[in-house]
């Protein structure tokens, strides 16, 4: 059920939204008031989040927003200036190897050994968590099948395409069947077929019981697979909630799209409509984003009719996460 959102706090211009209290399940990830500085630059500014067991939790934001820094701090790969981090209900420190064994990490940069084969790479990373050779053999076999690398077990990484390398990177991080998996931009620079395969695999891992933390600047991916989403920018949390909760935050309603030859005078008229938030026109395609209102389409068509413009095909699209980001920050997600 969708829950209403209310402003939580403002910190140096940041806007944080939180939902009303959810089910009292102990979070698998809890971060409170995390601050990370590089000299005078603030990478994370009082960053806070909670992730429940079984979620696919998305961290969405442009490059440089603080997503990777947040993950590295949570995993104790980076020191931080202040804050509290708990995993599985226990304080996380650099020496909590018992907690680290329950975690899988898939970094943004490919982290495999060039001199080892696909199978040897997966076996090596799995051995960091599983000492029993017989058990590890089965886990490695399952990981290879899971990512679809059965035909490449003896291949060296340099012989693999970008998409296959990404699959190997994932297999190395999840072979030991972790309860909590962090995936940092796992689909960067891969072809559409490999991207679809990776997203399907993430859904399957979640269905089998793993909690997923997924960072990306690809809005459509996060929108497709994540049960809850946090939007970040410049080290701040801007908004957090389900897909529908986030869209309910924005004043924008549906986007009206019309194929027509539109004059500059007509565009001026459209931009003056009381509910129009954004009007864009290029190559015969008119897009009008309006506030939620009952008569938006009629008002747009009336304005075109008054300018003696005959519209062609007309359709509407619901608001997207990019609309949420644009309204909160005033810029496109990928600027």
Protein language model features and the residues they cover:
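Conserved ABC transporter NBD signature motif
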Residues: 83-91, 98-99
């Amino acid at each position: 059920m969708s829950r209403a959102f209310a402003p939580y706090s403002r910190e140096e211009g940041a806007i944080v939204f939180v939902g009303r209290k959810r089910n009292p399940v102990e979070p698998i990830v809890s971060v409170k008031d995390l601050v990370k500085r590089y000299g005078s630059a603030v990478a994370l500014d009082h960053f806070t989040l909670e992730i429940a067991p079984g979620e696919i939790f998305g961290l969405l934001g442009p490059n440089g927003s603080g997503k990777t820094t947040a993950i590295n701090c949570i995993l104790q790969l980076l020191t931080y200036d202040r804050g509290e981090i708990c995993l599985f209900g226990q304080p996380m420190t650099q020496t909590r190897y018992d907690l680290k064994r329950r975690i899988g990490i898939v970094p943004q940069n490919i982290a495999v050994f060039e001199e080892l084969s696909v199978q040897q790479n997966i076996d090596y990373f799995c051995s960091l968590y599983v000492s029993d050779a017989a058990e590890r053999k089965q886990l490695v076999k399952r990981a290879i099948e899971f990512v679809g690398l059965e035909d490449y077990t003896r291949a060296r990484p340099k012989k693999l395409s970008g998409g296959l390398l990404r699959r190997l990177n994932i297999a190395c991080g999840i072979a030991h069947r972790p309860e909590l998996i962090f995936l940092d931009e796992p689909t960067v620079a891969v072809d559409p077929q490999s991207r679809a395969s990776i997203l399907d695999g993430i859904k399957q891992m979640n269905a089998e019981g793993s909690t997923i933390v997924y960072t990306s600047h690809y809005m459509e991916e996060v929108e497709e697979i994540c049960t809850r989403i946090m939007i970040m920018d410049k080290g701040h949390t801007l908004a957090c909630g389900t897909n529908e909760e986030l869209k309910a935050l924005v004043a924008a309603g549906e986007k009206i799209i019309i194929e027509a030859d539109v004059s500059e005078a007509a565009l001026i008229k459209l931009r003056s409509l009381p509910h129009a938030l954004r009007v864009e026109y290029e190559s015969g395609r008119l897009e009008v984003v309006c506030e939620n209102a009952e008569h938006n389409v009629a008002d747009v068509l009336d304005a075109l009719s008054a300018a003696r413009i005959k519209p062609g095909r007309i359709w509407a699209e619901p608001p997207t996460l990019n609309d949420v980001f644009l309204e909160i920050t005033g810029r496109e997600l990928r600027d």
